[in-house]
């Protein structure tokens, strides 16, 4: 059986217990622990952001040009094809240089500054798949869109996403 630490934390406070100690204590209680893995541990430079505004892309009927705050003075312009967003949503933002998981081949990839149909994009808004997470830990999250952070997450803009989602 695979046990989510996030799920277990709903029943027992694991805040100050590292993974190895948790596994050792589970084994001492009579439960067999074969190992543990930290989902999304290869993900880097992804932070909490807020969608400030969304405009239709001038050259596409399915893309949006978003202004996104990550706590800095100037918002980032990010182009997305996600259809589940609205202004003021709090979302994971992969900054230029970030490492995320490619949804197609499940390999790590670096985010680069680029253009989508002629409009500059300085990052990427992330789904939970791209963060190496599953819907088991976030059942409220949209399976086919950007991961909009819920009330169980810290929503401090600019915070590392691993810290924010616990």
Kindly label every feature range from the protein language model:
Residues 1-166:
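Phosphate-backbone binding interfaces of nucleic-acid-interacting proteins
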